[in-house]
Structures are given as C-alpha cells and as structure tokens.
A protein has these predicted regions:
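Phosphate-binding active sites in nucleotide-utilizing proteins
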Residues: 41, 60
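Catalytic core of pol beta-like nucleotidyltransferases
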Residues: 1-38, 48-54, 63-129
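Acidic active-site catalytic centers that drive phospho-/nucleotidyl reactions
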Residues: 56-58
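Active-site glycine-centered loops adjacent to acidic/histidine catalytic or metal-binding residues
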Residues: 44
Length: 129
C-alpha cells in the first residue's frame, strides 16, 4: 500500500500511471486528425506490459485516411519523443485488415489477443475481433 504522505508518493503515482498517460496522449493526437481513425490501439509488449526500456511500442492504426503514411510517421516520432522508445506504428486501411484476416496472417492473432483499444472499436478488425 502506498504511503501517500511520503515525499516520493507523487513521483511513484506518476510512474504508475505512465501507461495511461501514453494512451491519453495518443488519443489526443489522433482525435485531431481530419479523418477519424476506425481503430487505434496498443499491442505487443506495450499492451501486455512486459516490455523493458529497450522494447519498441507497437501501435495499430486502422483508417481510410489518404494521409495514412504521414500520420503513422508523425505519431511514431511523437511516441519516441514522449517515451524514449522506438515506436512501430502499423498503419492499415480497413481493406488491408480484411485481407490480413482472410489470409490468417499471424499478426492478426497478436492484435486480437493483445490489443488495448485507445480510439475506435475492436470491430474494425472484422471477423478476427
């Protein structure tokens, strides 16, 4: 149990909430995009919370935005600046996701198993959800 009177308590509480803060920052950025994404979520070690200081942060973005590549690159850079970790932001259109689901690509299993939804709906993963 945390002694909230301890001088280090605010720092401990801040460290404990880093995962939520990252999700909040990602949400704030993508909510400013002119075309709202269908789905944005953390997956991999960032979602499972079993990564370390060297782990990358995996983010899935599903959108019809024609500027998808630029949005993904910009978000990856922001995440790197916020965390110090490399970000692997995977941008896919809904059609891409449907094709990956039909092909039973292994990454789809990881998404359905680990994904923490930040924005949108898990149903954007189609039949894999």
């Amino acid at each position: 149990m945390l002694n909230r009177d301890h001088v280090a308590a605010p720092a401990v509480m801040l460290l404990a909430s880093l995962h939520g803060e990252l999700a909040n920052r990602i949400r704030a950025v993508v909510e400013e995009w002119p075309i709202p994404p269908k789905l944005v979520g953390l997956f991999g070690s960032a979602a499972r919370r079993d990564g370390d200081a060297r782990s990358d942060i995996d983010v899935l973005v599903v959108t019809d935005d024609p500027a998808l590549d630029d949005r993904v690159d910009d978000l990856a850079e922001l995440i790197r600046r916020w965390t110090g970790n490399r970000a692997q932001v995977v941008g896919r259109t809904p059609a891409d996701v449907a094709r990956l689901v039909r092909a039973k690509e292994p990454i789809v299993s990881e998404w359905t198993r680990d994904l923490i939804v930040i924005v949108g709906e898990r149903t954007a993963l189609g039949k894999a959800a």
